[in-house]
Amino acid sequence: MAANDTIADMLTRIRNANMARHQTTLVPATKMTRSIAKVLQEEGFIAEISEEGDEVKRNLVIALKYKGKNRQPLITALKRVSKPGLRVYSNRKELPRVLGGIGIAIISTSSGIMTDREARRQNVGGEVLCYVW
């Protein structure tokens, strides 16, 4: 089944796998999902990313991270901000802070997909894709 909003689909799959305490989850591989997964890995929210499948139908295998004996998920929440029906843009001066800097906002900029902190450092704005904390 083709998803209209691949980012929301990815976030939902990660959220559901986290709640079920799964080790990994599969996400359809696109340029956008690869970039978002790479940012999540760099920020320490997920453990590992790999690809599987043939050329036509590739999937990202995302290994999730948990902490402690009770296996509490590192990702508390994922929230889609900019949606296909209502895009949300932010200039460099108005980039959002998530929970006072504890969480991250993932921004799609002209320089690629990056966190809000990196966008501030590079002095660029863009489309606010999602919040992760």
Curated annotation (Swiss-Prot):
Taxonomy, superkingdom: Bacteria
Keywords attached to this entry: Ribonucleoprotein, Ribosomal protein, RNA-binding, rRNA-binding
Record-linked InterPro entries: Ribosomal_uS8, Ribosomal_uS8_CS, Ribosomal_uS8_sf
Coiled coil region boundaries: none
Quaternary structure and partners: Part of the 30S ribosomal subunit. Contacts proteins S5 and S12.
UniProt keyword annotation of Nucleotide-binding present: no
Function: One of the primary rRNA binding proteins, it binds directly to 16S rRNA central domain where it helps coordinate assembly of the platform of the 30S subunit.
Gene Ontology annotations of biological process type: translation
GO cellular component: ribonucleoprotein complex; ribosome
Family from the record: Belongs to the universal ribosomal protein uS8 family.
Protein name (database record): Small ribosomal subunit protein uS8
A GO MF label: rRNA binding
Alphabetical list of SUPFAM superfamilies matching this protein: Ribosomal protein S8 (SSF56047)
